[in-house]
């Protein structure tokens, strides 16, 4: 659990409840705390870098996203998922022949815990990301999930939770979304993206625009000092009382603007005025940045494509925004596919692939490919076993990291054996039932690797990722190695 500054919870609670200007009914687009007078940063950046979290809400099915392709492993996968004869599609298994165009060809083939060489392909709808992987601009981190400490199947089955603590509320959507984003279950107020941003605030002349969400509120972007500014795919959310007549009267608008400039003796009123002033200032800065010519790269028209297009436009305008470090959050829902997996999953993955590919191409166009890293996250993985028409809540999952600074065309981590059995055989020790992967890489390690690339010093990591001190060494390295 994060230890919060004693003065922040009350202020943060007030700011989060301040969604409307009471007199005007005008929504504030951000939860801006006193970012401008925040704690000293751990680093003062001289270049530009951005992290972009692509969150897949609902729990993505890992087995049909990064699909085992070598013949022995594929045959096990197909049998477990009720595939057809001769490696044909069936049940919730994909046909092996349909994976030929999206086979991943790393420089070095990954070897699983049993010493067997493995091969993977992406889902057939993910041709764009497969191309980026094979060109060296994307990597796969295998079997990531929340862990408090390194965990074996025997330790998972133990009743001694003092020695073998588990993440709370495993398999629960809301809690696992929160744990992925903040290391704490539902109700957490501080996320690791926001805590990374805390350390960069003083290097940004406009600190309020360090953390930006294009998909609504997310705890991932809330720091101890930094909080998120929210935009839509259409741009800045306007404070209409500052830019248009209120109740048809310019005089009322002028009066309201005058009121928020006044210093108040009542602390709550004073803080409210400061928040509103920053919201108006941030809106003005974002509008100016978005007035620049848009990137020529064509983005998909679907939701995720348009969210990432907005991120690309904001990155293009980073000098206008006055920022050198930024953390973004975008998302796509619909991945909780207990049924209709074969029918619905392809379109979702197609969105992810097309949007992330277009986004990478835009960073190349803007000359910032080496300075921007996008990565996937999700509530949890899912069962390898079929429930008849879909898969159920799981734990570990495979994730993609994309960008010019990514050491791509490679797999990181250890491939788990393809298994749903519950014997004492070595192949059966890497899941916790029904093929729910027991993570061999923690979210803390995944986040730490991204944070270090962003500029966070080793000594700052425990303040951002509370469990990172439980990991280290060859088996659970703090730096997973996928960033240059």
Question: Which stretches of residues belong to each language-model region?
Answer:
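Catalytic or ion-translocation cores adjacent to nucleophile or general acid/base/metal-coordination motifs
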Residues: 393-411
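Feature for exported/extracytoplasmic and membrane-associated proteins, marking the mature portion
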Residues: 2-365, 385, 407-484
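Active-site lining segments that contact anionic ligands and/or coordinate catalytic metals
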Residues: 325-327, 369, 377, 394-397
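Metal-dependent active-site segment of extracytoplasmic phospho-/sulfohydrolases and closely related
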Residues: 363-388
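Short glycine/threonine-rich loop-to-helix capping motif typified by GTGT followed
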Residues: 339-344, 380-396
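Hydrophobic, well-ordered secondary-structure elements that form the walls
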Residues: 379, 399, 450
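Generic beta-strand/beta-sheet core signal
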Residues: 331-333, 375-377, 402
């Amino acid at each position: 659990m994060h230890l919060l500054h004693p003065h922040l919870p009350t202020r943060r609670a007030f700011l989060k409840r301040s969604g409307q200007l009471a007199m005007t009914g005008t929504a504030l687009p951000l939860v801006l705390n006193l970012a401008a007078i925040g704690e000293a940063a751990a680093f003062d950046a001289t270049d530009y870098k951005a992290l972009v979290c692509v969150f897949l809400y609902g729990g993505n099915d890992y087995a049909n996203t990064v699909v085992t392709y070598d013949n022995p492993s594929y045959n096990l996968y197909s049998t477990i998922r009720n595939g057809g004869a001769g490696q044909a599609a069936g049940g919730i298994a994909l046909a092996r022949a349909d994976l030929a165009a999206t086979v991943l060809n790393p420089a070095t083939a990954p070897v699983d815990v049993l010493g067997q060489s493995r091969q993977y392909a992406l889902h057939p709808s993910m041709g764009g990301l497969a191309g980026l992987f094979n060109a060296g601009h994307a990597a796969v981190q295998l079997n990531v999930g929340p862990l408090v400490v390194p965990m074996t199947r025997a330790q998972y089955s133990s009743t001694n939770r003092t020695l073998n603590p588990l993440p709370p509320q495993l398999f629960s959507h809301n809690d696992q979304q929160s744990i992925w984003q903040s290391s704490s279950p539902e109700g957490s107020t501080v996320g690791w993206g926001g805590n990374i941003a805390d350390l960069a605030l003083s290097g940004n002349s406009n600190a309020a625009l360090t953390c930006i969400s294009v998909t609504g509120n997310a705890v991932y972007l809330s720091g101890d000092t930094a909080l998120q500014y929210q935009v839509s795919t259409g741009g800045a959310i306007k404070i209409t009382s500052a830019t248009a007549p209120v109740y048809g009267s310019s005089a009322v608008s002028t009066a309201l603007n005058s009121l928020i400039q006044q210093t108040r003796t009542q602390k709550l009123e004073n803080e409210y005025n400061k928040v509103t002033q920053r919201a108006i200032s941030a809106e003005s800065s974002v509008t100016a940045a978005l007035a620049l010519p848009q990137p020529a790269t064509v983005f998909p028209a679907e939701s995720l494509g348009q969210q990432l297009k907005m991120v690309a436009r904001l990155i293009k305008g980073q000098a206008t925004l006055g920022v050198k470090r930024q953390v973004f959050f975008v998302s796509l829902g619909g991945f909780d596919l207990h049924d209709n997996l074969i029918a619905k999953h392809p379109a979702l993955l197609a969105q992810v692939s097309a949007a992330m590919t277009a986004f990478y191409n835009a960073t190349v166009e803007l000359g910032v490919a080496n300075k921007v890293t996008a990565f996937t996250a999700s509530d949890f993985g899912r069962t390898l076993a079929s429930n008849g028409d879909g898969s159920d809540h799981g734990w570990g999952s495979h994730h993609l990291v994309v960008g010019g600074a990514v050491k791509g065309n490679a797999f990181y981590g250890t491939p788990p054996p393809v298994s749903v059995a519950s014997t004492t055989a070595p192949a059966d020790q890497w899941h916790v039932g029904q093929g729910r992967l027991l993570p061999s890489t923690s979210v803390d390690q995944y986040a730490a690797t991204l944070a270090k690339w962003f500029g966070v010093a080793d000594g700052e990591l425990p303040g951002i990722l509370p469990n990172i001190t439980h990991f280290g060494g060859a088996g659970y390295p703090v730096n997973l190695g996928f960033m240059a």
